[in-house]
């Protein structure tokens, strides 16, 4: 397994970690840096597949509903599955009208429950 910390190791906020195994990848979080002046595509890490055209990116797991963990989802393909805890998905749907731009809580993806294993490709 390869682990690539794109952002969040030497800063608070903007978390984004990529896991790769057997040629398949998932991201844990895709957050907006706390020092970002606005939510802009310029903060999107250079990760293959965020345009939805690389099938090796299986999805993005969001750890919790803080903007520094999910804030850049507005700049990726809506075809990428997004994993949330059920409460986080409800919170983000409720918050969507107050988010900048035309941000909508992602519908594509899966829910996960605390302490219940789930599989995404080679990841458990």
What annotation goes with each model-predicted range?
Residues 64-72, 120-123:
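Hydrophobic alpha-helical bundles that form the membrane domains of multi-pass transporters
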Residues 66, 88, 114:
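A generic "binding-loop/recognition-motif" signal
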Residues 106-117:
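Short acidic-hydrophobic, aromatic-tinged amphipathic segments that line or gate anion-handling sites
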């Amino acid at each position: 397994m390869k682990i690539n910390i794109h952002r969040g190791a030497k800063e608070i906020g903007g978390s984004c970690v990529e896991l790769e195994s057997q040629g398949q990848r998932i991201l844990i979080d895709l957050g907006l840096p706390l020092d970002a002046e606005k939510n802009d595509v310029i903060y999107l890490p250079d990760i293959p597949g965020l345009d939805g055209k690389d099938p090796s990116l299986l999805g993005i797991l969001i750890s919790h509903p803080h903007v520094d963990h999910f804030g850049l989802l507005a700049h990726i393909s809506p075809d990428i599955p997004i994993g949330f805890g059920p409460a986080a998905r409800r919170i983000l749907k409720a918050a969507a009208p107050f988010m900048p731009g035309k941000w909508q809580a992602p519908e594509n993806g899966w829910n996960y429950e605390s302490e219940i294993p789930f599989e995404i490709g080679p990841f458990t």
